[in-house]
């Protein structure tokens, strides 16, 4: 599902719900002569319960998407802070290790910014960037270790190594945040509820002598718009809503 465009998913869902609504109307028309006020009241009560349950699941899913978006935003800021701290602590290293560490961290910043622009569906490119990132982290760490070995008083270099360790941890946390999505099973459950609700609303409308399709279409459009927002929030590095890289850009 993550390989499909969010707009395509929302449009397909809209079409299926409208189709289910029309089928529901036809079924309601078929049952119209066999229905009385009690049947219509029961159908309306069930419809209200289903809509309430749908709103609960929809709100829960939206909350999950927002939490994951906030987590990714926080991870971006934390990584930028960790890199900035390591960059400042290069001044604690003796020459020539300070210049080597500064150059390596500058390269690391550019690599991380380049990684942040790659779609998660481009697996090969992401894998290559992750390998390059790990190799550069090791190079920065080796520079710190070499500086500690060459320095008779390694306290200052120890501060730098601590910052590098936090830099690596922040990278791991951000990588983990990118992999966390709303479980696909929840989306499938939502889609089943949406389609069933559309059919039920259509059936309830079909039981009436007069009906209007406009309210049902408006409700369907609002549902699909909310689904689009949820999916967009749940998909980092693609779509309309993305985590800004201001903190990382400021390190340049």
What positions do the PLM features span?
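Alpha-helical transmembrane anchor segments
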Residues: 2-10, 14-33, 176-252
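N-terminal low-complexity, intrinsically disordered segments
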Residues: 34-45
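A generic, lipid-embedded transmembrane alpha helix
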Residues: 44-62
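Transmembrane signal-anchor/signal-peptide helices with a preference for the extracytoplasmic
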Residues: 57-78, 234
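Juxtamembrane/interfacial segments around transmembrane helices
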Residues: 63, 97-113, 237-249
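Short extracytoplasmic/periplasmic juxtamembrane "stem" segments immediately C-terminal to an N-terminal membrane anchor
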Residues: 76-93, 244-252
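Structured inter-helical modules in multipass membrane proteins
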Residues: 86-179
């Amino acid at each position: 599902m993550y390989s499909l465009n969010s707009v395509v998913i929302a449009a397909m869902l809209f079409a299926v719900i409208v189709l289910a609504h029309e089928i529901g109307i036809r079924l309601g028309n078929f049952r119209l002569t066999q229905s009385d006020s009690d049947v219509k009241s029961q159908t309306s009560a069930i419809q209200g319960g289903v809509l309430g349950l749908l709103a609960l699941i929809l709100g829960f899913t939206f909350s999950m998407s927002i939490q994951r978006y906030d987590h990714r935003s926080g991870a971006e800021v934390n990584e930028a802070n960790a890199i900035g701290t390591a960059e400042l602590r290069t001044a604690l290293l003796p020459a020539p290790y300070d210049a080597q560490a500064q150059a390596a961290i500058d390269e690391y910043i550019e690599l991380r910014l380049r990684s942040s622009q790659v779609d998660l569906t481009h697996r090969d490119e992401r894998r290559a960037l992750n390998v390059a990132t790990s190799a550069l982290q090791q190079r920065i760490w080796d520079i710190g270790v070499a500086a500690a070995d060459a320095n008779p008083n390694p306290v200052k270099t120890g501060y730098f190594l601590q910052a590098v360790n936090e830099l690596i941890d922040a990278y791991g946390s951000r990588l983990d945040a990118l992999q966390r999505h709303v479980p696909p099973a929840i989306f499938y459950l939502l889609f089943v509820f949406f389609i069933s609700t559309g059919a039920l609303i259509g059936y309830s409308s079909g039981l009436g002598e007069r009906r209007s399709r406009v309210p049902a279409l408006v409700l369907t459009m609002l549902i699909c718009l909310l689904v689009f927002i949820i999916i967009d929030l749940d998909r980092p590095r693609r779509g309309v809503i993305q985590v800004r890289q201001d903190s990382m850009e400021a390190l340049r």
